């Protein structure tokens, strides 16, 4: 085993592991951080969506009921995945990726994919709509873990180790850009580079790749008025505080109003139709307003604990595949959280990305359930 994510862990063959890991306990620190984020998320989604539900659905409890349903579904998914033998995950990695790519193609078909906000990203499932890009992220991590673990002797070579994975990465990215979904494309690119490095690729190769990504990314932004407006609003939101910069300005006002202790739960003003997407992409700003700096620190601590325990699982895993899988899923989960928080505090352009386990949303919650369930399964079989 030569991957950086697992270089300290000894190898144990798959046949020595049971089909279902019933005798091992999950990582309770990992589980506790997840439950803490879920609990805070339920409270804040209810608070943020109360008036929105009353105005949009004539039912103040409409959105929180749906969120509770999403959490229950994600919890069931996480429970069953936490009992799965990682060897089975390795077997289904490639078929699962093909299934995810099929859904990305399906969403582009008129009449099947739904258009919202100028993007065709959703498939209607009756009571709610499903966003395939949210599922694609963890499935691509699963694929990378399987593929990289089988090519350890070639990872120092660009042509035979790095390039094949980059070519494969372009398939979901091109489908996502057709929706368009620039945020999910950026996340998959970021996670791929991180996992290539963890899998043993040369830093010089990845650094050159990072530089090579800049020109096409800049071209995509420059030739898309919508994305260009987001970037200009990010650079100077106060130039157009009632237009393109409105959302970011309102986010700043939320944090400024909250101070250290916050205005108090339920006492925030931004949820009264001032801050767009306050229950989804900008829920961190509402936490800052009502719970203050202390509430924001609590969120960061929970994600910090999740990151430390997830990476601990990666370094203590018994083989290369599970080590890379734990590393990739942890990096994906925490990376998305940092991107969301970075947008809310004005460090990054707006991307339309939810805060995992906290924001409202069925697709993101199911994706989080998938990630958490697999991490718990990996923690069961990691060395203590």
Q: Which role fits each region the language model picked out?
A:
Residues 126-136, 178-180, 259-264, 283, ...:
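Glycine/serine-rich anion-binding loops at beta->alpha junctions
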Residues 1-20, 338-384:
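A juxtamembrane structural motif centered on a specific transmembrane helix
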Residues 259-294, 317, 321:
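Long extracytoplasmic/lumenal interhelical loops at the membrane interface
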Residues 123, 155, 162, 260-261, ...:
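Short clusters of hydrophobic/aromatic residues that line enzyme substrate/ligand-binding pockets
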Residues 19-34:
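N-terminal membrane topogenic signal
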Residues 30-47, 53-247, 285-343, 370-374:
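Hydrophobic alpha-helical transmembrane segments of multi-pass inner membrane proteins, especially
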């Amino acid at each position: 085993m030569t991957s950086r994510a697992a270089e300290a862990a000894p190898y144990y063959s798959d046949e020595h592991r049971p089909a279902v890991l019933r005798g091992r306990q999950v990582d309770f620190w990992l589980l506790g951080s997840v439950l803490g984020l879920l609990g805070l998320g339920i409270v804040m989604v209810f608070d943020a969506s109360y008036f929105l539900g009353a105005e949009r659905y004539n039912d103040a409890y409409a959105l929180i009921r749906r969120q509770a349903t999403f959490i229950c579904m994600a919890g069931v998914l996480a429970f069953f995945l936490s009992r799965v033998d990682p060897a089975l995950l390795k077997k289904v990695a490639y078929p699962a990726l093909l299934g995810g790519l099929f859904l990305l193609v399906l969403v582009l078909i008129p009449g099947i994919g739904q258009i919202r906000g100028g993007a065709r990203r959703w498939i209607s499932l009756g009571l709610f709509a499903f966003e395939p890009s949210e599922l694609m992220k963890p499935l691509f991590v699963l694929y990378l873990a399987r593929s990289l673990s089988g090519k350890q002797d070639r990872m120092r070579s660009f042509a035979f180790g790095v390039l094949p994975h980059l070519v494969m990465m372009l398939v979901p990215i091109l489908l996502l850009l057709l929706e368009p979904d620039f945020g999910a494309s950026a996340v998959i690119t970021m996670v791929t580079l991180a996992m290539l490095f963890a899998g043993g690729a040369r830093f010089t190769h990845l650094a050159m790749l990072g530089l090579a990504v800049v020109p096409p990314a800049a071209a995509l932004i420059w030739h898309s008025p919508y994305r260009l407006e987001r970037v200009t609003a990010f650079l100077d939101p106060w130039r157009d505080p009632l237009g393109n910069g409105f959302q970011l300005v309102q986010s700043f006002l939320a944090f400024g109003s909250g101070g250290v202790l916050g205005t108090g739960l339920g006492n925030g003003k931004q949820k009264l139709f001032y801050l767009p997407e306050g229950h989804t992409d900008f829920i961190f700003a509402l936490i800052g307003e009502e719970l203050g700096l202390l509430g924001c620190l609590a969120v960061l601590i929970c994600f910090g604990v999740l990151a430390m325990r997830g990476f601990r699982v990666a370094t203590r895993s018994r083989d290369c595949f599970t080590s890379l899988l734990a590393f990739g899923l942890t990096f994906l989960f925490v990376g998305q959280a940092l991107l969301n928080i970075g947008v809310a505090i004005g460090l990054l352009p707006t991307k339309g990305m939810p805060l995992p386990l906290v924001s409202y949303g069925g697709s993101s919650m199911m994706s989080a359930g998938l990630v958490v369930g697999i991490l718990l399964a990996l923690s069961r079989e990691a060395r203590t």
